Design a protein with these regions (language model features):
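Intrinsic-disorder-associated, low-complexity terminal segments enriched in Asp/Asn/His/Tyr and depleted
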Residues: 147-153, 160
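Short acidic, glycine/serine/threonine-rich loops at helix termini
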Residues: 82-83, 111, 184-186, 212-216, ...
């Protein structure tokens, strides 16, 4: 499946949309008085690209069977997920202000019983990749079955005696780099590589921070790419705030039919608000009302220049 060309005009529109999403994140967190700031702001560009350019999805028909699946593993960054969903039409933008409130559909960690448009509930770090691997494996089994009947727009091809996938539907999984400290991720990496799940594309938010500090001081991950390649994955490094480069990385990933792909997206935590950027202390706290007002002024000033 090839994506539409990403023109300069479309990139500008995505930049504006990402800014809108960042503003919503700040407003949500200030209203809630709790939550995570750095990760959602840092992932806003990636969520924007996916929801407004990459994903096959239909907000008017959320249960569409041919939709791509997007699994959010590090569920604590859900303000950016909720904002992307609202701005793309899944529910009213005004509902974002109910984040973390009693009875709200927008829980502090995403929960499918409250918000049925979600593909997974997330909370325990490290669980999302295993969920995504299970979905990708199930799709592979279905693909092989449907290919025999020639009644689907997905198919398998034989290459060197093994079966690889060409598919119109992908399983995407977003991960935090800090959560790679959890061991069950590595079981999932092994399983996906062994089973050549070419319909699985994972994106790790390599922002180098976690709640207690810098990732490389707490539990070093590097050389991350080499480690994942050893599990028979294809690995792509990309700057996580360059829409053109991100789009090209996804296209490259979709061409890898015989391997799962990990995109290491190097992002700036707190991106868009200078006082929040690259400061691990903003991993798990919200801005105050005054800090939020200052952040919104900065974001609105940037939007006026796009």
């Amino acid at each position: 499946m090839l994506m539409a060309f990403l023109s300069e005009a479309k990139i500008k529109n995505l930049e504006i949309k990402a800014n809108d999403i960042r503003q919503s994140i700040i407003e949500m967190l200030v209203e809630a008085g709790s939550g995570h700031t750095a990760g959602p702001l840092g992932m806003a560009d990636i969520f924007t690209l996916f929801y407004f350019h990459i994903l096959r999805h239909d907000p008017k028909n959320p249960s569409w069977s041919e939709r791509d699946r997007l699994i959010l593993s590090n569920g604590h960054i859900c303000p950016v997920l909720y904002a992307a969903m609202a701005h793309s039409g899944y529910f009213p933008v005004e509902e974002l202000k109910t984040l973390r409130k009693f009875g709200s559909r927008l829980q502090g960690h995403p929960h499918r019983e409250f918000l049925p448009y979600l593909e997974n509930s997330s909370g325990p770090l490290g669980s999302g990749l295993s969920q995504a691997v299970g979905m990708a494996m199930a799709d592979k089994i279905d693909i092989l079955s449907m290919d025999e009947n020639k009644n689907s727009d997905v198919s398998s091809v034989k290459s060197n005696g093994s079966t690889t996938l060409t598919a119109s539907r992908y399983i995407y999984c977003f991960l935090g780099d800090g959560e790679l400290d959890e061991g069950n991720n590595w079981e999932a990496f092994m399983f996906a590589g062994k089973n050549k799940l070419g319909n699985l594309i994972a994106v790790v938010d390599r922002n180098n921070i976690q709640i207690d500090g810098i990732t490389e001081k707490i539990m070093p991950l590097e050389p991350l790419g080499d480690k994942i390649r050893a599990f028979n994955w294809y690995v792509i490094d990309v700057y996580g705030h360059d829409f053109k480069a991100l789009n090209e990385a996804i296209e490259e990933a979709q061409a890898m039919y015989n391997k799962p792909v990990l995109i290491i997206a190097h992002t700036v935590p707190g991106k868009g608000v200078k006082n929040f950027e690259r400061d691990y202390r903003w991993h798990g706290k919200p801005p105050t009302k005054e800090e939020g007002e200052k952040a919104l002024r900065e974001l609105k000033e940037f939007r006026s220049m796009v």
